[in-house]
Design a protein with these regions (language model features):
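Bacterial N-terminal signal peptides
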Residues: 11-21
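Sec/Tat signal peptide C-region and signal peptidase I cleavage site
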Residues: 23-27
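Generic macromolecular interface patches on structured domains
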Residues: 2-5, 18, 76, 101
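Bacterial N-terminal signal peptides that target proteins for export
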Residues: 1-13
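C-terminal-biased regions
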Residues: 28-56, 67-152
Length: 152
């Protein structure tokens, strides 16, 4: 019995050490996130204000501000269904159905260093919301950041 307790303790210790060694690889600084956005999208500085507005609006259930950050039309996945949102007013009128309380809380707590960035855009709240740089012209010389995906 003493031998098996020692073996279990040793195995548990090895697992803890393994996770401790891996954990820092997932941590990233604000600067690393900024650099990744800049590398993939080229306009990291322009994300700051829309992102802050989104986080604050989710905290305060400000449907109008969130609606103004969306690129329309937008397909929203919520409550096991898909909704095609055509306008700001459509979004505001259906806000409580389209954005769950859980998503509002998660986005409202979003930290910049916890953003996930890939070529599709910037993911918030484990994929509940995505923002992307949306081209304003054919050459994509001008773009703006907008909500492009909502998955509750």
């Amino acid at each position: 019995l003493e031998f098996s307790v020692h073996r279990i303790t040793s195995a548990l210790f090895a697992v803890i050490i393994a996770f401790t060694a891996v954990t820092p690889a997932f941590a990233q600084s604000d600067q690393e996130v900024y650099n990744r956005i800049e590398q993939l999208h080229g306009n990291a500085r322009q994300l700051d204000q829309p992102l802050r507005s989104l986080v604050e609006a989710m905290r305060s259930d400000d449907a109008q501000t969130i609606a103004g950050l969306i690129e329309y039309p937008l397909t929203v996945k919520a409550n096991g269904e898909e909704y095609e949102i055509q306008s700001e007013q459509d979004f505001v009128d259906n806000f409580d159905t389209l954005i769950s309380a859980q998503t509002r809380r998660a986005v409202g707590r979003q930290q910049y260093s916890d953003l996930f960035v890939n070529s599709d855009g910037v993911m918030l709240a484990d994929g509940a919301v995505w923002m992307a740089a949306v081209c304003e012209d054919d050459d994509c010389d001008n773009s703006h950041w907008a909500i492009t995906v909502i998955n509750n």
